[in-house]
Amino acid sequence: MRRLALLLAGVAGVAVAAAPGTAEARAKVHVMVVGKSAVLAGPERVALKARTARVGGKRCSIGRATPLSVLAGTGVSFSLKDYGACSSRARDAGSLYVRRIGPDRESGTDGWVYKVGRRAGSGGAADPAGSFGTGRKLRRDQHVLWFWCVKDAADSCQRTLEVKPARERAEPGAALQVTVRGYDDSGDGVRVEGALVRLGDAAALTGADGAATLTAPAAGSYRLQAEKPGMVVSFPVRVAVG
């Protein structure tokens, strides 16, 4: 399946290799795993570490700054198939393919895909050439989304949502405008009508312009998130009230 996540996971066991004691080695990225009907892991920050996983009867190394490694770092159960010859060398992991995450296993043309930022990766999830074949690996504070892809007639996945508040601090009872966009595999976005946005106990639907206005709840720190049937729920954005 085109672009469906390559990587590995054998049966649960993922061992973390020792990481160099540098600032780079301590870098983390934001990760979320969204299945057919539920969020399976995250959102959370996961360290960029070299990891290993068992595939069949052998243990294979996975490069530290790859979507497959951070998937393993969430602790979610997953299984992989090796279409190459993975080994103790991370450079051999480029053909690992993710067949299952949690209860959701590939079926027909539907299966697991990852995005880095807004774009679907064009390379294997543990490919040493990077997610887009440029040699660039994951970097500190990037967003990595694993999601269950339902292919359409054009061989594209459903859009993934992104919610943006007009500001990230508001007073209780104040109006807060938010905008929701949906991004395709290439990272091209459109404003989304009919998305449900939530901030604590406040909720609203977006209009044709992709915008909605929420009434800020009581003082506190809240996650702002957007969802719509047929699209992938957004990463949450933290909003401070009060």
Predicted regions and their residues:
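Secretory targeting and sorting signals
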Residues: M1-E24
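Ubiquitin-like/PB1-type beta-grasp interaction modules and other compact soluble beta-rich domains
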Residues: G21-G242
